[in-house]
Amino acid sequence: MTMENNMIPHEVVSRIVDGALPVEAWREHLNLSQEEVAKRMGISHSDYAQQETVAKPRKATREKIAAAFGIKGDQLEL
């Protein structure tokens, strides 16, 4: 699923309100496993899992994760 604009789906916002970090909320919304995202990014599963624990990833990291999700980097900024 690719987001053509900067909209953030209600399901993602709801998960964030419930306490999930944006990266995790988006991954779950897109029905991706941590392993799949790690493969798309070319990193290990453990390295990706660590990224989901960072409240505000660096811009370069955010852009890489967004590319793996098929969204824009600023959609991970909430």
Language model features by range: what are they?
Residues 4-30:
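A short, Lys/Arg-rich alpha-helix, primarily the initiator
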Residues 21-40, 64:
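Short basic helix-loop element that most often maps to the first helix and adjoining turn
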Residues 22, 47-50, 75:
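Residue-level recognition of specific faces of alpha-helices
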Residues 34, 45-46, 73:
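The DNA-contacting recognition helix of HTH DNA-binding domains
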Residues 42-57:
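Recognition helix of helix-turn-helix/homeodomain-like DNA-binding domains
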Residues 59-76:
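DNA major-groove recognition helix of helix-turn-helix/homeodomain DNA-binding modules
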